[in-house]
Every structure is written in structure tokens, then in C-alpha cells.
């Protein structure tokens, strides 16, 4: 982990992904070799074993091809790390790197039409505290194009909210993949609902909290989006044919900016 942080400067999520990949490989190899984890040797993992492991996580753990390739990249990085420090393993590293990433057909991008996004935004109840939070979350993601992970990490101090009376736009600072930061403008409607949500709270707090006043996770946000998407399907049945998640809302913003609907936001 020190190498990933200090020398590679990888983002926290990537660090965790690499750690999990190595853990899965170690457990799988120990089971196949019928050894305890602390008895494993580097020679217990060869190219054939790596291919078997990748097939296992695809078929048994139901990993997508993208996740499979992420696991492979982590193992290649581990092999390179070992070879750099122990040159006697250069051939072993080269052998593992003969295992290539798997190609996949590009997934079709799912877009929402204006009536569909409206139905999604209207699904939360404004009569409850959690309903108000969920509407604020959906509108924020719709406005900013934030990923679920980015929305989960937004703190109150990342928001710059203005009334707009002097022409100053509200904005949010989003912390994305690889430590990248970008600033996104916020509409008046988004500003108003966020002001209500964060009133009286500490600037260091996350904007979106769960019912226990703990920060929402990206998994929690995904569950919220899919729950309201199911509710919105009752109003717009065409949505039943679409796989809707946080990224679907993210895809709507570029479409919106190219349409006449954007002027009214």
C-alpha cells in the first residue's frame, strides 16, 4: 500500500481495488494449492493459474468484464512491483503479463427523456425529511452530473451558494477520480433546495447524510436512485425498458445542454 500511495499516487478507490484483487487471488490460489495462505510461494501463481482465477471471478462471482480487467491490472502491477525489487522474478512477471485484458462490446448508453427525468425528480415525497433529502440529492446529481461517489463525498464547505441577486452563480467543487477536482455551476432551484438541506449544519459535514446522520455511501445513493426510478415507472411506463442508475442521470446533463430545455433550468 505504501508503494501505491507514495510512488504510484493512486486514488483511494484504486488502492482499495488493488488490495481486494490481491486478496481474492491469494485466497483462490491457497484453495487450489491446498495450502495455508502463509505457505504460498510466488511460483504457485503462473499464467494458467491467473487465467483460471479470472474465469472464476467472472463465472462464480459474476464480475463484469470491466471488473475482471481491473483485477488483472492490479495483479500485473503487483508482478511489476515484485520484479522491480527482485530481478530474479522478471521472467515470472513477463509470464503473468502474457495474460491480456478481455475485450467487451461497448454498452449502449441509456438516456432519459425530459418527462422521465421529471418523473424521477418528482418521486420523493416533500412531506418527509428523508424525502426532501432524496429530492435534493436527485436534483443535485441531475444539475451537476456528479457520479455517485462524488455526490457522496461532497461536504458543505464544497458548496458556494448565492442568491443570484448580484449575478453571482452558485457552484460546487466536486472531487472525482484520480484526485481530480472540477467546479460545476448550480441552478437557482438546486441552490434553494440545498440551502434548506444544510441550514444550521457544520461546514465540515457531508451534504448528504443517512437516517443515522452518517454520510451516504455510493452504494446508498445507487439504492436511492433505483428505488425512485421504480416509483417513476408507474408514471412513465416507458422507463421500465431502461436500466436506470446514478450514471443514467449523469448522462442526461450533456444531452440537456444541447437541447432547448436547458434554457428553462
Question: Where do the language-model regions lie?
Answer:
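Conserved catalytic core of the tyrosine transesterase superfamily
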Residues: 1-265
Amino acid at each position: 500500500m505504501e508503494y501505491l500511495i507514495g510512488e504510484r499516487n493512486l486514488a483511494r478507490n484504486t488502492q482499495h481495488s488493488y488490495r481486494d484483487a490481491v486478496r481474492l487471488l491469494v485466497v483462490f490460489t491457497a484453495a487450489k494449492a491446498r495450502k495455508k495462505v502463509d505457505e504460498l510461494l510466488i511460483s504457485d501463481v503462473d499464467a494458467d493459474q491467473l487465467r483460471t482465477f479470472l474465469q472464476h471471478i467472472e463465472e462464480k462471482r459474476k464480475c463484469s468484464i470491466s471488473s475482471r480487467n481491473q483485477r488483472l491490472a492490479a495483479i500485473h502491477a503487483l508482478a511489476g512491483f515484485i520484479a522491480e525489487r527482485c530481478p530474479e522474478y522478471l521472467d515470472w512477471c513477463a509470464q503473468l503479463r502474457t495474460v491480456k485484458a478481455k475485450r467487451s462490446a461497448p454498452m449502449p448508453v441509456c438516456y432519459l427523456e425530459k418527462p422521465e427525468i421529471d418523473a424521477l425528480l418528482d418521486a420523493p415525497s416533500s412531506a418527509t425529511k428523508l424525502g426532501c433529502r432524496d429530492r435534493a440529492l436527485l436534483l443535485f446529481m441531475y444539475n451537476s452530473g456528479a457520479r455517485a461517489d462524488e455526490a457522496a463525498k461532497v461536504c458543505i464547505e464544497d458548496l458556494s451558494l448565492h442568491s443570484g441577486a448580484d449575478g453571482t452563480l452558485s457552484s460546487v467543487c466536486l472531487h472525482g477520480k484520480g484526485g481530480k477536482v472540477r467546479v460545476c455551476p448550480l441552478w437557482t432551484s438546486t441552490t434553494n433546495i440545498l440551502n434548506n438541506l444544510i441550514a444550521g449544519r457544520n461546514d465540515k459535514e457531508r451534504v448528504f447524510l443517512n437516517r443515522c446522520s452518517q454520510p451516504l455511501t455510493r452504494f446508498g445513493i445507487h439504492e436511492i436512485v433505483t428505488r425512485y426510478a421504480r416509483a417513476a415507472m408507474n408514471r412513465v411506463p416507458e422507463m421500465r425498458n431502461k436500466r436506470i442508475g446514478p450514471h443514467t442521470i449523469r448522462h442526461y446533463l450533456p444531452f440537456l445542454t444541447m437541447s432547448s430545455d436547458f434554457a428553462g433550468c
